[in-house]
Amino acid sequence: MLNQLQRDILRLKKEKNAIILAHNYQSREIQEIADFKGDSLELCIEASRIEGKDIVVFCGVDFMAETAYILNPDKKILIPDRGAECPMAHMLSAEDVRMARKRYPDAAVVLYVNTLAEAKAEADILCTSANAVRVVESLDEDLVLFGPDRNLAWYVQEHTDKTIIPIPEEGHCYVHKMFTAGDVMAAKEKYPEAELLIHPECDPEVQELADHILSTGGMLRRVLESDAESFIIGTEVDMTTRISLESDKKTIPLLEEAICENMKLHTLEKVKNSLINEEFVVTVPDEIARRARRAVERMIRVSE
């Protein structure tokens, strides 16, 4: 049963001819009013297919809303709280990428979508945690500059013969850095029958203990397709909420404290105000958007 605030949002969404996109880490009440929920890759693909809407309300962090604009420069892209920034996306600047290219002129540059538009514009192609290995394998170059998440870079290196150089050396997601091998061992001892699903932004010693290393979208598919009845979820805590909307199987957060405070800045009240006032508008300068779009679209072609 939707509450009054949720019903108000659905009414406003119809009046404004808007669509609401939400990342899997959003709260239950926001996931319940979203037109589409997904991981970074799924949201990129969905954003590239939007037709017949004037406004896109993006319940995610800054780089996600920027990507929606890059793919839809003719639409008004709104983010309910403009303070919703991804710390990892701010760990790699466009200048950092240019300097790395000068140092390794024969390398391809693969950037995680978790980067700001200015950095994306310097990339040859983008990737997400769902398609990173496939993207790297699609390249002719044997040397790949990969950033900004060093743990995802490690994961890719484990699954390719190419040489992966992380840029910067210590880029990371603060939420996934919370998980330790000790947390995993304790959870497996407490829930021995549960499958352990781990995100590739986790540290290598955590990944090595996983039953499956998956993006959040991959985690949802695994739960739906597996014969197992319980799962330990090694990513942001509200991924268990996302799964619960699709499945009655038992999901246990690896850490209850694994909360992305940046994602949680969005609330129903802010979504409502975003629609009423058409705020906060997200744009990207034309030349940066053009160059970044090329890298985004190349990724989407590899993924489809």
Swiss-Prot record:
Pathway: Cofactor biosynthesis; NAD(+) biosynthesis; quinolinate from iminoaspartate: step 1/1
Reactions the enzyme catalyzes: iminosuccinate + dihydroxyacetone phosphate = quinolinate + phosphate + 2 H2O + H(+)
Residue positions binding [4Fe-4S] cluster: 86, 173, 260
A GO molecular-function annotation: quinolinate synthetase A activity
Cell compartment(s), UniProt: Cytoplasm
Keyword terms of this UniProt record: 4Fe-4S, Cytoplasm, Iron, Iron-sulfur, Metal-binding, Pyridine nucleotide biosynthesis, Transferase
Cytoplasm listed as a keyword: yes
Gene assigned in the entry: nadA
A cellular component term, taken from the record's GO annotations: cytoplasm
Organism whose genome encodes this protein: Methanothermobacter thermautotrophicus (strain ATCC 29096 / DSM 1053 / JCM 10044 / NBRC 100330 / Delta H) (Methanobacterium thermoautotrophicum)
Family to which this protein belongs: Belongs to the quinolinate synthase family. Type 2 subfamily.
A single GO BP: 'de novo' NAD biosynthetic process from L-aspartate
Main location per the UniProt record: cytoplasm
Function: Catalyzes the condensation of iminoaspartate with dihydroxyacetone phosphate to form quinolinate.
UniProt cross-references to NCBIfam families, sorted A to Z: nadA, PRK09375.1-2
Protein's UniProt name: Quinolinate synthase
Cofactor note: Binds 1 [4Fe-4S] cluster per subunit.
Residues annotated as binding iminosuccinate: 23, 40, 112-114, 129, 199-201, 216
Cofactor(s) required for function per UniProt: [4Fe-4S] cluster
Keyword ATP-binding attributed: no
EC numbers on record: 2.5.1.72
